Amino acid sequence: IAKEASPYMIQRGRGTIIYTSSTAAYRGNKGQHSHAAAMGGRRMLCQTLNAQYASQGIHVTHILVDGAVDAPDTLGKMLGPELFQKLRETRGSEDGLLIPVEMAETYYHVATQHRSAWTHELDLRAYSDVAWWNHA
């Protein structure tokens, strides 16, 4: 993305590139070696791209989605209809799952920030989730 989009952004003197990763960008789970390496690599890619392009007006940011997204077409298919419905009933009420439209608002905010206060890394997590570093 950066390789293809950055020349146009450099020409304009501005632009935003947002990469999204999962929790595995910070910590790996048992049996997910390749996934953790890829997500961690994406996080580091954002840092190096930011170092390369920020002075040219290009904002590169990494958004970590650290939680279950209320998405029947993805999480629902992965879990199956019954388990997904149970998750919605137990954690989805009161906005306990990440809501896609609210996530989109956050992405929009990051994409339109003034360059004096760019966000370079951001975690999205529902209020009902306990951060992974606080688990007993």
Predicted regions and their residues:
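Active-site-adjacent segment of SDR/Rossmann-fold oxidoreductases
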Residues: 4, 9, 27, 48-58
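Active-site helix of classical SDR
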Residues: 2, 38-42
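Short-chain dehydrogenase/reductase
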Residues: 2, 46, 104-107
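Residue(s) in the substrate-gating loop at a strand-loop-helix junction
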Residues: 22
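Active-site loop immediately N-terminal to the catalytic Tyr-X3-Lys motif
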Residues: 27-33
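C-terminal helical subdomain
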Residues: 55-58, 62-67, 79-136
